[in-house]
Amino acid sequence: MKFTRLLRGSTTLVAVSALAPVLGCGGAAPEPAAPEMVDAEPVQTSRPSMSSRSEIGGMNEEKVQAAFQRASPRLSRCYEKGVERIPYLGGEIRFKVRVAEDGTARWAFVKDSTLGDRDTEACMLKVLKATRWPKPVGGEGLAENSFTFEPSSDERPPVPWTPDQLGTPYKKARPALESCRSQAGASQLKATLYIDTDGKPLSVGVSSADERGEDAAECVAGALREITFPSPGSYASKVSVDID
């Protein structure tokens, strides 16, 4: 099956404590063959002070970029599997990874995504969790990266929808979706759906504002898959909704 693989993004490296915020930036540059990550302007990170080294860790920028680069072919294979099921699958996905002091991933989650396929997202998370990361210095570290995937230009894109077009079925499902979120202790979630001509979801993807959202993702995706929405007409639609 013919499709275009466009992988682009930027790596954000920070010195962080367990509760420190992360600020990321994105960049873009297409790669015609095997997808490669292209970085935006270098992110400046400060060295931890003597008083804070017990709480925060610094990471070597070049080594973290290299780790994402090594993972990119496997991320692309996850996407290829998704395209086999959904030919017009595409969108941007942003990951956040917490790296333990031994260089393993303590956790990884989808921070934001318009990809719309949980199976593909889960496959990519598995790749990142298995990736060997550079060891942070002075504590644990965080890294973020955004990637954009685009299907072949031969594929007709789905019709864009707004949440209001999901109608009464979605309104009735909101309490169950909010229960998924609250039981996991997560903050805001976002779900992206492809809806077939019969109103049934073809696939559902879920992103979250924090790592606890991963515990809610399958619950949310499962609940949305059971709903029959209004028909989008003669072609599939795509929509994103916030769950908070």
Predicted regions: what they are:
Residues K2-A18:
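Bacterial N-terminal signal peptides that target proteins for export
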Residues P21-G24:
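C-terminal motif of bacterial Sec signal peptides marking the signal peptidase cleavage site
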Residues G26-D244:
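Charge-biased low-complexity segments
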